[in-house]
């Protein structure tokens, strides 16, 4: 891949037109390398017949420019290959058959963020052409010859460190160049082969990716087997240690037995020789050995006692830890039980608050209904009372009118009585005067009028006087009758006035009672409002408690979980303490074995990593070779050994850098896999938590639905009870109204008297007013109006009779 990229970069650098190159870079590269090699690159065209001076002038003017060619023009070319050797350069020079001396200029063409091999650009100073035979078929400064690096054909006025660029076309076509160097001309088939190889490589990669999980399972099984083997190894090591201890004991016992046998032999020899015990060396040696054994036994006993004491201390510490852990577990269990109790109490309180809230809500609804009913009844009563008050006022106005009419009648009666008295006085005076006149007529006849008066005139005067007297008497009787009628009317009107006053007093009393009832109803309404406010405050408190209850329940559940976790932690600590006590004896050996196994694992991992890197490197090399074969160009370069070594060194460094990058990529891949595994584990944990929460939410929703169903059932029962209660109340109200109507009707009948009172009003007005007001009155007022209806016609009949009689 890198070779192809460098070749593409070099192809981008080379063009048909000659471009400028930094002369400082050329001089620095020449001074660093100090190499001048004459390389045979390409053929000079036949049309080129310029001399050395013209070429020198061209190189002087164009020495800071680069040559770039394509497949058709064929100017000086750049070719980079890590497998290039000096022999290839020599063969290229022989094939071209051109004598030229040139200096090589090394120029690195690098792409960003890529490591590529340096590209080599060849500049040459031509001394002749193939046509005039000025060139030599073999270069003087070839790596195969040891000579001067300076070309013999270089002009004197040109610096030896300055190179010349040949812009001639080396080949007529790409096919010719490829056929000269033994390349491949069937590019399509080559590309197809490259594509097939790439597909094969991709399939192999897919197979490798598919085999990765199998290898993972194999590695897991191998790790499990390794753990089992390690356990067996630990057990065998323990057995080996025990056997070693037993062997040491047996060896010490054997040595002691040997010492005892040797001392016994010495003692037997001394006894045979007759040496006493006080002087014998064997006895002394036995005594010293016994003392030494005694001291060693004492030291061992003391060490064993110390070990026992330490073990007892450790055991006591473990027992204390166990007791502490057990206490912690018990405390945690007690805390969890208390939390459960608190949760139960809170649930009971929640249920009680819900019930109280429902009852308060029901009482609130009842109070609202009562308040609405009381308000409606109060409105109806006030409306009825207003109507009754208006009727009473109208009746009072009528009574006032009747009183005024009675007063007018009294005044008329007084005037009539005064006229009657005057008439009586006039009659008496007339009678006296008439008697006197008759007396005078009978005694004396001196008056001419009386004398001349005839007898029939006197009879006519007497008759007229009698008629006048009769008329006066009739008028007197009429006036007396009218006076009696007026007296009766005034008495009846006084009675009616007294009755109206009593009814007005009763109405005022009713109004007072109604005001008292209204005040009591208002007080009850205020009380119900205060109760409603208290119920609403209780509802708010209950809602706040209901809002806080889930939090408290959650907190209690969290505390219970914490207590359970503490209990589990305490149990785990106890178990770990026991395991640590058991593993304290063989800790060192197990640690060594683990370290050894870890080292082995590290080495195996490194080896597998190396194998993977080698495989990746081989794949990359195969791809690079394939692509290099795909992009074979007809360019060849002859380099010196030092340049080749430097290039190979750089290639090796590039390979190392690539390997380092591959290793870093592998490590990143492993880290990514680890992070992926961790994320998957976290995802599984989150999924578990989500499942648990979903289950809890489902249970909570089921409980809420059950509670709602219960609430709906209670509300339905409450509605049924209210409907039944309303029906009963309506039935009772209907019965009461019927009773009141019956009582009022009977009372009206009892109150009707045979002596009806007449009123000064027309029949049409009385009937019209009664018919309009009858619909909006209570039963009592209806009964009273019936009595008035019965009395009014009699009154009008009496007045009509009186008028007809007067006429």
UniProtKB/Swiss-Prot annotation:
InterPro entries given in the database record: Web
Function: Required for the chloroplast avoidance response under high intensity blue light. This avoidance response consists in the relocation of chloroplasts on the anticlinal side of exposed cells. Acts in association with PMI2 to maintain the velocity of chloroplast photorelocation movement via cp-actin filaments regulation.
Protein name (record): Protein WEAK CHLOROPLAST MOVEMENT UNDER BLUE LIGHT 1
Biased composition (Basic and acidic residues): 537-548, 722-732, 739-749
Gene: WEB1
Tissue: Ubiquitous but preferentially in chloroplast-containing tissues.
Presence of the UniProt keyword Transferase in the record: no
Positions carrying Phosphoserine: 148
Protein species of origin: Arabidopsis thaliana (Mouse-ear cress)
Complex formation: Interacts with PMI2.
Record-stated family: Belongs to the WEB family.
Gene Ontology terms: cellular component: cytosol; peroxisome
Predominant subcellular localization, coarse grouping: cytoplasm
Lineage: Eukaryota, Viridiplantae, Streptophyta, Embryophyta, Tracheophyta
